[in-house]
């Protein structure tokens, strides 16, 4: 028997489920370029789509890893047997995904690459992928004992207004190095895309599109136009004289 819950509780429960699932997959698939999760609920089953840059690693050998993840999710969230399905989907444009770039920068810093060089490499890759702008902030004990932050910016970046919600993709990650924990924040401003594949369909409010004038067909031969004047009033019938 299904338990009836209010709409408010339903929204809260869905939010908690997605947040917990996202945290679990972030820990589990960090090395495989995990970039987010989508949950689609149908009347018969729940479909969980994992977005990643290396989908083959997520699936595992002969689909073993995805089956293990399905079993863990099913047990943790109390889904009935066979009612949850996990899929792996490749991220179309890795350079426009903030989570993927934050993870990439994290592994570069763990590998011992200099902060400035690693950040400029990520910045260049993002801009080459077609982004309108990007911002990378690394904070912590970068050099010496005193904590400080370094900001790297390129292109255009909006910070306020409603378009921030759908134009700016943000990700925050932490990396533990020998000198302490560094914080990584990546912000990517997506380009406007009428098809909606690599960016929002809705243009920015200040976007101005210039419409090309239509080609006027010029007359090849002289044409005379007769403009009609005022129509003459109909003649009144003349009275017939009587003898």
UniProtKB/Swiss-Prot annotation:
GO terms for molecular function: class I DNA-(apurinic or apyrimidinic site) endonuclease activity; damaged DNA binding; DNA binding; DNA endonuclease activity; DNA-(apurinic or apyrimidinic site) endonuclease activity; DNA-binding transcription factor binding; enzyme binding; Hsp70 protein binding. GO terms for biological process: apoptotic process; base-excision repair; cell division; cellular response to hydrogen peroxide; cellular response to reactive oxygen species; cellular response to tumor necrosis factor; chromosome segregation; cytoplasmic translation. Changing residue 230 to R: No effect on sumoylation. Abolishes sumoylation. Does not affect ubiquitination in response to ribosome stalling. InterPro entries: KH_dom-like_a/b, KH_dom_type_2, KH_sf_prok-type, Ribosomal_S3_C_sf, Ribosomal_uS3_C, Ribosomal_uS3_CS, Ribosomal_uS3_euk/arc. Changing residue 227 to R: Does not affect ubiquitination in response to ribosome stalling. Its EC number is 4.2.99.18. Residues 231-243 have a biased composition (Pro residues). The modification N6-acetyllysine is found at residue 62. It is a peripheral membrane protein. The modification Asymmetric dimethylarginine is found at residues 64-65, 67. Changing residue 221 to A: No effect on phosphorylation by MAPK. Significantly reduces phosphorylation by CDK1 and nuclear accumulation. Greatly reduced phosphorylation by PRKCD. Abolishes phosphorylation by PRKCD. One of its GO terms (cellular component) is extracellular exosome. The modification Phosphothreonine is found at residues 42, 70, 220-221, 242. Optimum pH is between 8.0 and 9.0 with activity decreasing sharply below 8.0. There is a cross-link at residues 214, 230 (Glycyl lysine isopeptide (Lys-Gly) (interchain with G-Cter in SUMO2)). Residues 21-92 form the KH type-2 domain. Changing residue 42 to D: Phosphomimetic mutant which is detected exclusively in the nucleus. Pfam families: KH_2, Ribosomal_S3_C. Methylation by PRMT1 is required for import into the nucleolus and for ribosome assembly. Sumoylation by SUMO1 enhances protein stability through increased resistance to proteolysis. Sumoylation occurs at one or more of the three consensus sites, Lys-18, Lys-214 and Lys-230. PANTHER family: 30S/40S RIBOSOMAL PROTEIN S3, SMALL RIBOSOMAL SUBUNIT PROTEIN US3. Component of the small ribosomal subunit. The ribosome is a large ribonucleoprotein complex responsible for the synthesis of proteins in the cell. Has endonuclease activity and plays a role in repair of damaged DNA. Cleaves phosphodiester bonds of DNAs containing altered bases with broad specificity and cleaves supercoiled DNA more efficiently than relaxed DNA. Displays high binding affinity for 7,8-dihydro-8-oxoguanine (8-oxoG), a common DNA lesion caused by reactive oxygen species (ROS). Has also been shown to bind with similar affinity to intact and damaged DNA. Component of the 40S small ribosomal subunit. Identified in a IGF2BP1-dependent mRNP granule complex containing untranslated mRNAs. Interacts with HNRPD. Interacts with PRMT1; the interaction methylates RPS3. Interacts with SUMO1; the interaction sumoylates RPS3. Interacts with UBC9. Interacts with CDK1; the interaction phosphorylates RPS3. Interacts with PRKCD; the interaction phosphorylates RPS3. Interacts with PKB/AKT; the interaction phosphorylates RPS3. This is Small ribosomal subunit protein uS3. It comes from Homo sapiens (Human).
